[in-house]
A protein has these predicted regions:
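Glycine-rich beta-alpha loop segments
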Residues: 21-54
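Short, acidic/small-residue loops that bind anionic groups at enzyme active sites
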Residues: 119-139
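Short hydrophobic/aromatic-enriched beta-strand-loop microsegments
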Residues: 54-55, 71-82, 150-153
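Short, glycine-/small-residue-rich phosphate/pyrophosphate-handling segment
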Residues: 134-159
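Short internal beta-strands
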Residues: 53-61
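N-terminal amphipathic/basic-hydrophobic helices that include classical n-h-c signal peptides
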Residues: 1-17
Length: 159
């Protein structure tokens, strides 16, 4: 978002300044057990960016991120207890702007339908979604540049 301010100088000449203010986004973070340390390291590396936004995470992942970053995390239940379903509900209501879900593709999960539902909903509602570190880094840097501000327009328009 850009804000333009008109300011009068001492000679009553109009001076125009433009400041940029990034929209605060709601970011969902989930990590399978084998990826939790990777998620912690990701959160440490990008703490400065994450601190400018509201972070939502499944229970254990959120607690682990809080421990290493001191960020305030809105925590759902643990993933296998319904946390992924809680995130899915927020996605359906257009309350999440981006999801980083560090998945372990080698270990099948008993709650795999919940995982697939999150993926399906992100695709349905055009929520930027990463399942690996490379894509997560691209998204977090795009977030920092303001490349995801189009999400705010969608929310305002009720889309």
């Amino acid at each position: 978002m850009h804000f333009i301010y008109l300011i009068l100088d001492a000679a009553n000449n109009v001076q125009m300044t433009c400041t940029e203010m990034r929209a605060k986004m709601n970011i969902g973070l989930i990590a399978h057990d084998a990826k939790k340390i990777l998620m912690q390291n990701f959160a440490i590396a990008y703490r400065g960016i994450l601190s400018k936004h509201d972070i939502y995470a499944t229970g254990t992942t959120g607690r682990l991120i809080e421990e290493v970053t001191n960020l305030n995390i809105h925590k759902y239940l643990a993933g296998h207890l319904g946390g992924e379903q809680q995130l899915a509900s927020q996605i359906e209501h257009n309350q999440i702007d981006m999801v980083i879900f560090l998945r372990d593709p080698l270990s099948p999960k008993s709650h795999e339908p919940d995982v697939n539902n999150v993926i399906h909903l992100c695709d349905t509602y055009n929520i930027p979604f990463a399942t690996n570190l490379a894509t997560a880094e691209l998204l977090i840097k795009a977030l920092d540049r303001g490349d995801l501000e189009w999400r705010e327009i969608l929310k305002r328009e009720g889309l």
